[in-house]
């Protein structure tokens, strides 16, 4: 990824691991369970009066098959889309723009290639 910036957010990684945990089973779920948030940790942060704003959306390719348990756990955070369609990119950018109150716009400049 020469010449590209990469931003890694620990909070985002934690959120994604939690979402993946709900979609996993067996030894994968067991391994992921070591890294997901617990109510005990969340209560400690709340007690310190810390504010953090986060949005999580999971977009999956419309032709992929997803487990019902996974879909039930993440609910409205999940949407199937066509990543090569400009309307998908517009919808993702609009969601991010509204949530960040215009601070991040656009997030994506062009449709995503399925091979990337």
Swiss-Prot record:
InterPro entries recorded: Serpin_dom, Serpin_fam, Serpin_sf, Serpin_sf_1
GO molecular function, one term: serine-type endopeptidase inhibitor activity
Database matches in Gene3D superfamilies: Antithrombin, subunit I, domain 2 (3.30.497.10), Helix hairpin bin (1.10.287.580)
Gene Ontology cellular component list: extracellular space
Family note: Belongs to the serpin family. Poxviruses subfamily.
Family matches, as PANTHER family: GH10112P-RELATED, SERINE PROTEASE INHIBITOR, SERPIN
Protein known as: Putative serine proteinase inhibitor 2 homolog first part
